[in-house]
C-alpha cells in the first residue's frame, strides 16, 4: 500500500507538470525511486496509473466539498466558500491539479467541474428562491460566473507556478473578485454613473 501511495503521488506531480502524453512510467519510476518492475506490478499501464491519480484527486475534491456543505450556511455563502475551497485545493493539492489536467487531456474522462457544478447550480437555485440573489441574477448565469472564476484561477496558478516570480495566492485573489461580484463595480447610486447599453438583456 505504501508503494502504491508513493507512486500515485509521484505520478500526480509528473502529470501535473508535463501532462499525460508528456509523462512516462520510466519517468515516474525514476522520480519515485521505485523499480519499473514494481511500478508495473501495481500499475501495468500508464493509463491505469492515471486513473488512480484521477480517482484520488476526485476523492480529495469530494471530501472537501462535503466539509464545506456540512457547515449549513445560507446557500449563497456556501457557494462562495465552496469556490474558495476549490481554489485552495488547486493551489495546494498536487493530486487535484493533476486530476484537473488529466480529466481535460484524456478522452472519455469526466470533467473535474462536473464534480461540483451541479452542487453550485442547486445552491444558487436555492439562493434565488430564498431572495439571496437579485431578481435579474439568474442562477444559470451565476453558475457560469463561478465556472469562469475557477477556470481563471487554474490558468492563473499554472502560469505563475512554473516561474520563480512571487505571486499572489489564488484564494486571496478570488476573495477580492467575489467582493467585486457581490458588491459591484459600477457607482450606480452616484450622479453621472455610466450606463452599459451593450449589457442590456434582449427584449
Whereabouts are the PLM-identified features?
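C-terminal peripheral helix-coil segments that are non-catalytic and often amphipathic
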Residues: 114, 118-130, 159-203
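Short hydrophobic/aromatic patch on the recognition helix
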Residues: 32-43
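Short, charged helix-capping/linker segments at alpha-helix termini
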Residues: 21-22, 133
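Short linear capping/connector segments at secondary-structure termini
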Residues: 98-106, 196-199
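Hydrophobic alpha-helical connector segments
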Residues: 52, 63-92, 96, 105-108, ...
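Basic, helix-initiating cap at the start of DNA-binding domains
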Residues: 1-18, 25-31, 47-52, 60
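Amphipathic alpha-helical packing segments from all-alpha helical-bundle domains
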Residues: 59-62, 105-132, 137-148, 172
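Amphipathic alpha-helical interaction segments
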Residues: 6, 77-85, 141-148, 172, ...
Amino acid at each position: 500500500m505504501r508503494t502504491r501511495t508513493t507512486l500515485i503521488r509521484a505520478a500526480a506531480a509528473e502529470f501535473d507538470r508535463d501532462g499525460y502524453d508528456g509523462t512516462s512510467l520510466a519517468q515516474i519510476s525514476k522520480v519515485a525511486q521505485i523499480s519499473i518492475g514494481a511500478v508495473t506490478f501495481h500499475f501495468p499501464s500508464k493509463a491505469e496509473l492515471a486513473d488512480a491519480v484521477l480517482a484520488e484527486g476526485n476523492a480529495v475534491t469530494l471530501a472537501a466539498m462535503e466539509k464545506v456543505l456540512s457547515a449549513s450556511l445560507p446557500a449563497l455563502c456556501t457557494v462562495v466558500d465552496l469556490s474558495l475551497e476549490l481554489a485552495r485545493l488547486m493551489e495546494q493539492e498536487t493530486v487535484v491539479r493533476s486530476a484537473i489536467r488529466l480529466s481535460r487531456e484524456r478522452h472519455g474522462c469526466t470533467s473535474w467541474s462536473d464534480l461540483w457544478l451541479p452542487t453550485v447550480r442547486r445552491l444558487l437555485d436555492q439562493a434565488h428562491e430564498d431572495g439571496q440573489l437579485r431578481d435579474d441574477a439568474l442562477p444559470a448565469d451565476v453558475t457560469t460566473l463561478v465556472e469562469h472564476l475557477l477556470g481563471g484561477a487554474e490558468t492563473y496558478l499554472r502560469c505563475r507556478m512554473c516561474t520563480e516570480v512571487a505571486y499572489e495566492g489564488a484564494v486571496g485573489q478570488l476573495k477580492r473578485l467575489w467582493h467585486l461580484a457581490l458588491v459591484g463595480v459600477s457607482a450606480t447610486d452616484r450622479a453621472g454613473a455610466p450606463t452599459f447599453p451593450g449589457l442590456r438583456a434582449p427584449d
